[in-house]
């Protein structure tokens, strides 16, 4: 059987036991490590009295190993130089939080890049952070991670018109709250640090997909499955047919993520 099962990346830190198996998962974003202390007694050619003490140990970013920092100083410097490279400029800031109110410069920028770089008819994209910001002025490599923090690749898929419509209906159904005083699906909570009331979205921001390259409207008062009305392609496409369209999206979404 399996004595210890160690997981990673799954977003919820967890220490658990099931039968004789110990499970430890450190969570995401390298904020903790899974640690299991094992003690046993060797008897002849086998081990007896095995005990497992699992824990999730939080990492303190302020307690840096000096020897490790010295060992990797040249690598840290190389990354710093690379991320400081200018790649362009902006005449206005890009704010990901504006995506939740409708069309905005941030989400339009993602759609533009995906369509222009792939040649696709349509783009699916989502705000990958709630409050990512790039100020106006010079844009550097490190700024791009503020609005696009994940290492996805760009995929292009062929989809029918009905599939595109169903995709958008599903996306907006996860966000729109028709039978409520709120426009979007939010839930109340409590800030554990202050004890004050707080609010959060029911869904993850990176699942709030919209479409670029399409002229369409969303009726927030309509029932689920009847909210989207697609009017036309935003740009002429010689390759598109009434049945099949090319759609650019992240590899995460193309493989079924979200």
Which residue ranges define each predicted feature?
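Basic, gly/Ser/Thr/Pro-rich low-complexity segments located predominantly at protein N termini
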Residues: 13, 32, 50, 82-89, ...
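Active-site-adjacent helix-turn-beta-strand microarchitecture at beta-sheet edges
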Residues: 1-85, 175-179, 183
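N-terminal catalytic scaffold of extracellular/periplasmic and nuclease hydrolases
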Residues: 1-42, 96, 100-111, 115, ...
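Feature captures C-terminal
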Residues: 108-258
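A short C-terminal boundary segment appended to hydrolase-like catalytic domains
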Residues: 40-139, 147, 199, 223-225, ...
């Amino acid at each position: 059987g399996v004595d210890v099962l160690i997981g990673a990346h799954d977003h919820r830190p967890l220490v658990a036991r099931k039968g004789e198996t110990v499970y430890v998962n450190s969570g995401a974003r390298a904020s903790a490590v899974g640690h299991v202390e094992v003690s046993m007694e060797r008897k002849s050619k086998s081990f007896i009295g095995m005990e497992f003490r699992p824990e999730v140990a939080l990492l303190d970013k302020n307690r840096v190993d000096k020897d490790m920092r010295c060992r990797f100083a040249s690598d840290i410097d190389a990354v710093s130089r690379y991320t400081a490279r200018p790649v362009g400029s902006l005449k206005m800031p890009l704010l990901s939080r504006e995506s939740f109110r409708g069309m905005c410069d941030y989400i339009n920028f993602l759609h533009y890049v995906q369509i222009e770089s792939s040649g696709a008819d349509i783009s699916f994209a989502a705000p990958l952070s709630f409050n990512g910001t790039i100020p106006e002025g010079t844009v550097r490599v490190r700024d791009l991670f503020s609005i696009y923090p994940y290492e996805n690749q760009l995929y292009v898929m062929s989809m029918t018109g009905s599939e595109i419509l169903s995709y958008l209906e599903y996306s907006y159904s996860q966000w729109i709250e028709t039978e409520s005083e709120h426009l979007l699906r939010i839930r109340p909570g409590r800030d554990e640090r202050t004890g004050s009331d707080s609010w959060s979205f029911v869904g993850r921001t990176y699942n709030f997909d919209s479409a670029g390259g399409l002229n369409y409207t969303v009726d927030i008062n309509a029932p689920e499955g009847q909210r989207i009305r697609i009017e036309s392609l935003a740009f002429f496409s010689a390759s598109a047919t009434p049945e099949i369209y090319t759609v650019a999206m992240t590899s995460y979404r193309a493989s079924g993520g979200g």
